[in-house]
Amino acid sequence: MSKIEVLVACMNQHNDELYSTMNLQTDAILANQCDEHSYREYIQPDGNTVKLISSADRGVGKNRNKALAYATGEYVINADQDMIFVDGYSQKIEEAFSKIPQADMIIFNLEYLNRFTPGKKQKQKFKRLHLWNSMRYGTARAVIRRGAIEKNCLSYSTLYGGGAKYCSGEDSLFIREAFKKGLKIYITPTVIAKVKQEESSWFTGLNDKYFIDKGVLIANAFPALKNLFVYYFAFGKRNVSKDHSFFKICKLMRQGFKQYKNI
């Protein structure tokens, strides 16, 4: 059994081919969204085990929760199927945790082969992450002590992300919940994978739904500060879309507040 286990949220897989495609070098779980319910295990030539858990359920949050339920590694890496891991990533991870043994979660860096993904930023230095600046980071590339997840009963929201009602945010809420439970979270510039994303499962442009969904997410994550976050977010996006002024963005996000109240 590997000390490190990669949990991949994926779609329409029929075998363990992703193990080689993603350059995996540890145990892995493929939480596979498709049209059947099945479970298979594959032993790799290097001795690692790949678990293929297929389900017809929809939503990336459900996928990630299934992977967590089957995980056995001391450290688990949340990953997407468009990631290609660098050689020796497991050693890089173990070295990082040995340097900061108090860490419950470390968010590593990714090298983007294109810049399709909106809002992703390269991390330039190692530092402690705080709640106020955590919303910009996703959990794909986050490495977490599995014991901390189980001890604190952490799971992903099934309302957000690809395949769910609202377009994104399940990973941001996971990190926020981790902070609320007292986990110590760090970020590091160490690259553990490359991303070759060419299309998004949720991002269809800066349309009305995008801003409404952001309002739903902010009302969930920061109920006491949601109005302040609206102005902050709208100011940052005011010149990005010619069809969405500062005031229109605020209006749409407040529609999201109302939707969240009625969930």
Language model feature labels by segment:
Residues 76:
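Short aromatic/hydrophobic "clamp" motif used to bind/position activated sugar donors
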Residues 118-147:
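Short, flexible, basic/aromatic active-site loop/helix in glycosyltransferases
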Residues 156-158, 182-194, 206-207, 226-229:
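Catalytic beta-strand/loop signature of glycosyltransferases that borders the donor
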Residues 1-27:
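N-proximal low-complexity "stem/linker" segments adjacent to membrane-targeting elements
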Residues 159-173:
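Acidic donor-binding loop at a coil-to-helix junction in glycosyltransferase catalytic cores
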Residues 88-121:
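Conserved donor NDP-sugar-binding/catalytic core segment of glycosyltransferases
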